[in-house]
Swiss-Prot record:
It is found in: Cytoplasm. This is Histidine--tRNA ligase. Its EC number is 6.1.1.21. Its main location: cytoplasm. It catalyses: tRNA(His) + L-histidine + ATP = L-histidyl-tRNA(His) + AMP + diphosphate + H(+). PROSITE patterns: AA_TRNA_LIGASE_II (PS50862). The gene is hisS. It holds the Pfam family HGTP_anticodon. Homodimer. It comes from Bacteroides fragilis (strain YCH46). One of its GO terms (molecular function) is ATP binding.
Length: 454
């Protein structure tokens, strides 16, 4: 007996109903991006490892899916290297390419490669899958879609403001209540400076970014393991646990970071973004959260994260400013800021809260019953007119028993069935049945179209 087929952990198949829901998500996000003047691009699923490595920090590099070279890749490996069993070293010999970890780094590579064709500031969006060799769990997958929007070639903070408006608009359209969290890497840098651990900024941000997941005690333990002094850890506590309104937090930070020019610059930027957004009348809550660190190496200014308020799940959107990203590809001085919607987590949230609009997940609206060759030929004429009017319609392909065809309509939740037998053909009409109410009505093609498009 053949082994039952399976799929890799952390990946999923999607049924037609699930794809209808996913397309509702993608189309909603795409429509909002278009409202703000963003244009779509795509990049390859695989990138050179030299493009990807070193852009996500040590932890991110470990999560890259590497693609084994084709051909005789053992020919360049010595016996000594094989016997060493050094996985990282051997991988560098076997693999030159990797699956993309996110859409931001490939976008930076795209900008550098196509700089002569791009008009700046360049507002692009991209909706494609990414892959991470992570441990699968609820809300975390190894293959998932991101829906990114980025602006490069402008350092104006109005870009940050517009991206937050996009986030607010998208989740308002979905009907998901969210909290938009904002912070600034310059504030975090300033905090590292005033506690006397400026050179440990990456270790500090990686640790405090885990506060929600592992708790304060474990964050402090990790900080200590990274060589951060007890005194510095003690100074850090009241800062990362700072409470109050956004205005109160900013006022406190101005005092706390008074000796850090970088830190004060971060406060100034955050104040501008928050104050401007306040005049926009956002529908969702926005919060300055000093524990938001997003443990990635490339953010240099504002950073964002979005949490759903009515569902226990991780971040469903994130982003930030990454002024230095294109520099590693030989193109300095290009400032960029972007956001990324986690479509797969949004899918789960909409499912849990039952927020999908009925019209978004409905497939076929009308099924023509097939009684035989003559009846099918007559039905095809009405069917063509219905489709031309924008009605999603189909005909059962075989002249099967009526019970089987009606069962097909029920299973697929098709709301209307058109029955065309000899009597209907003689009158040039069809019997239209409402599958929910059971009501039947003899109608012309025009009346049928009117009933389904009103």
């Amino acid at each position: 007996m053949a082994a039952k087929p399976g799929i890799p952990k952390g990946t999923r198949d999607f049924s037609p109903v699930e794809m209808a829901k996913r397309n509702y998500i993608f189309n909603t996000i795409r429509d909002v991006y278009h409202l703000y003047g963003f244009q779509q691009i795509e990049t390859p699923s695989m990138e050179m490892l030299s493009t990807l490595m070193g852009k996500y920090g040590e932890e991110g590099d470990k999560l890259l899916f590497k693609i084994q070279n084709s051909g005789d890749y053992f020919s360049g490996i010595t016996d000594e290297e094989l016997l060493s069993r050094n996985a990282a070293k051997l991988a560098s010999k076997f693999c030159e390419k990797g699956l993309r970890y996110d859409l931001t780094v490939p976008f930076a590579r795209y900008v550098v490669m196509h700089r002569d064709e791009i008009t700046f500031p360049f507002k692009r969006y991209q909706i494609q899958p990414v892959w991470r060799a992570d441990r699968p769990q609820k809300g975390r997958y190894r293959e998932f879609y991101q829906c990114d929007a980025d602006v490069v070639g402008s350092d104006s903070l109005l870009n940050e403001v517009e991206l937050m408006q996009i986030v607010d608009t998208v989740f308002t359209r979905f009907g998901i209540r969210v909290c938009i969290k904002i912070n600034n890497r310059k504030i975090l840098t300033g905090i590292a400076e005033i506690i006397g651990e400026a050179d440990k900024i990456v270790d500090i941000t990686v640790a405090i970014d885990k506060l929600d997941k592992i708790g304060l005690d474990n964050v402090n333990k990790e900080l200590a393991e990274k060589g951060i002094s007890e005194e510095a850890i003690a100074k850090l506590q009241p800062i990362i646990l700072l409470s109050g309104t956004n205005t109160e937090k900013l006022a406190t930070l101005k005092t706390v970071l008074s000796d850090s020019e970088t830190g004060l610059k971060g406060v100034e930027e955050s104040e501008f973004i928050l104050n401007t957004l306040q005049t926009m009348g956002l529908k969702n809550e926005i919060e300055l959260d000093l524990t938001l660190a997003r443990g990635l190496n490339y953010y240099t200014g504002a950073i964002f994260e979005v949490k759903a308020l009515d569902v226990q799940i991780g971040s469903i959107t994130g982003g930030g400013r990454y002024d230095n990203l294109t520099g590693v590809f030989g193109m300095a001085g290009v400032s960029g800021v972007g956001i990324s919607f986690g479509a797969d987590r949004i899918f789960d949230v909409l499912n849990q809260l039952e927020l999908y609009p009925k019209e978004a997940v409905n497939g076929t609206q009308l099924l023509f019953i097939n009684f035989g060759e003559k009846e099918a030929a007559f039905s095809m004429g009405i069917l063509s007119k219905a489709r031309a009017a924008g009605i999603r319609a189909e005909i059962f392909p075989d002249a099967a028993k009526m019970k089987k065809q009606m069962s097909y309509a029920n299973v697929k939740n098709i709301p209307f069935v058109a029955i065309v037998g000899e009597n209907e053909m003689n009158e040039g009409k069809a019997m239209l049945k409402n599958m929910e109410s059971g009501e039947q009505q003899l109608v012309t093609a025009e009346e049928l179209i009117g009933a389904l498009t009103k």
